[in-house]
């Protein structure tokens, strides 16, 4: 049965979401490779998995459908065309050489689809291939080198694709460590029975090509509703990527305006949702740095000729108020004194997942910010995050809404 896929806001009733439980990819993280793979530290994968199960069950207890990326990928591999496409794109002749690549693809094609999905996200080392596969490429590599690097950032399903009103952007990622993630999502959205033939728009990123500087990540995209989309211009999401997405949204009449805000280019502000999330009709959780009056902000609208009209805004808050038709945005800033606020922002106090207006999921460790939410009438459903939080992503980062009501 074809499911409905539509995301009309950040705060309407959440109905269906895609998550990725920690698996082999995080077990491949070591102190020597974690920074290359965009992590600050190694995690206890078993404990992270337990915490993730609590997160998923919290959503299920609220009546929200939870789909797991590994399950979707495994089921997608049941489609012969999808399996062939994924093996061709993820095991490249140009990376491994035509003979070795063919041998590896042939061997992978014979394993169970669950095991193949595990390797497509968790990576593959030279030590794992059969001894019968012999090649100069094998002879010149250490057994612990990667044939296919792991994708530990699949944990953050928010970034690789984002649903915006009646369509999806399958995002070209900025960092090499994440670019192969997008191919797994391309395959799921093309061939999985849940999505294949669905009446939704693919705005951007569905082609497996070099997007150069036109990169986009879902953590920077907030569907604030009423025909508006708010996008952070970060170290991962570029003006070029924003323009491509905005033009597609306007072409398909799915948005009336796109608000673009420039973010500080440092690790703690990696994406807009690490410093700002929409949690109630007129209420945003923010780390104050992003709403300073001197932050650059523009509103993009259609120019009537297929291009974009750009309007400089006086402040981000004013742009949001105009878009939502409200008199004043209410802000809940990160809690505690200056030291506590910086610590809690680093631990994703602002990166909460709104389930419905005024109800969010967030890490229990952020006690000062959670107390401010409570005093403001926002209900926090707390989840543990001592290990998950070390990946530098909270409940919003770890979730990709597939169906959410508008406002």
UniProtKB/Swiss-Prot annotation:
In its UniProt entry, the species of origin is given as Escherichia coli O6:H1 (strain CFT073 / ATCC 700928 / UPEC)
Molecular function terms in GO for this entry?
A: arginine deiminase activity
User: For this UniProt entry, what is the primary localization, expressed as one broad class?
Assistant: cytoplasm
InterPro entries hit by this protein: Arg_deiminase (IPR003876)
Q: Write down what this protein is called.
A: Arginine deiminase
Localization (cell): Cytoplasm
Catalytic residues (UniProt) = 397
Q: Give its E.C. classification number.
A: 3.5.3.6
State the pathway, as annotated in the record: Amino-acid degradation; L-arginine degradation via ADI pathway; carbamoyl phosphate from L-arginine: step 1/2
A single BP term in Gene Ontology: arginine deiminase pathway
Which protein family is it in?
Answer: Belongs to the arginine deiminase family.
A GO cellular-component term linked to this record: cytoplasm
Q: Which domain of life is it from?
A: Bacteria
Could you tell me what reaction this enzyme catalyses?
L-arginine + H2O = L-citrulline + NH4(+)
Give the signal sequence positions.
none
Answer whether the UniProt record assigns the keyword Hydrolase to this protein. Answer: yes
Q: Does the keyword tRNA-binding apply?
A: no
Which UniProt keywords are listed? Arginine metabolism, Cytoplasm, Hydrolase
Give the top-level enzyme category.
hydrolase
